[in-house]
Amino acid sequence: MKKNTLFLILLIFVIFCFIVLFKGLSKDNSYKPNINFGKKLSSFEGKNFFNDQLINSNELFSENKIYVLNIWASWCAPCRAEHSILMELKKNKVIEIIGINYKDNLKNAKKFVDEYGNPYSEILIDEDGTIAISLGAYGIPETIVVDRNQIILKKFFGAINNKSLKEINSLTK
């Protein structure tokens, strides 16, 4: 009798654990941080990738174009995967792509750009991650699309793909 009661309690506990585990695994865990679409981008500044000149973000958004800010690093595998998409996006003359090189070894980053091509009109160095933090980045790669007034139109988490390319290009029409 005692053995049966102990077995029943253990069985109920195991079933309860499976139910809790199943509920937890079936929850949607695709967390999307609050993006302030329609809000102005925080201003930032960083050193130019090629000449170390300090650039304020307000200097970058002067023409009547769509601006794509891409946070990347040479050590980031998804950044490598999306690079061909950025090269394709560069062909759209109404779009300027601004690269934010995140916590990277400058020598490796320059080698990456030389080897794979440079889709960026400007590249800023983000040595300590402060630019990415000010932009609300949660990881890399991340891509933020803004208009000339620095209003956030779209944000992509992770590597952009052909679908993202179409979405960004559609913003120019």
Residue spans for each PLM region:
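Short, Lys/Arg-enriched, disordered terminal segments
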Residues: 1-7, 28-33, 58-59, 91-92, ...
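N-terminal targeting signals for export/organelle localization
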Residues: 1-47
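A short beta-strand-turn-helix
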Residues: 43-67
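Short pre-active-site segment immediately N-terminal to redox-active cysteine/selenocysteine motifs
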Residues: 65-67, 71-75, 139
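Hydrophobic beta-strand anchors of alpha/beta hydrolase catalytic cores
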Residues: 68-69, 97, 143
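Conserved redox-active cysteine motifs that mediate thiol-disulfide chemistry
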Residues: 71-88
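Conserved segment of the thioredoxin-like fold in thiol-based oxidoreductases
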Residues: 91-92, 96-128, 140
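Thiol/disulfide oxidoreductase modules built on the thioredoxin-like
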Residues: 114-119, 126-172
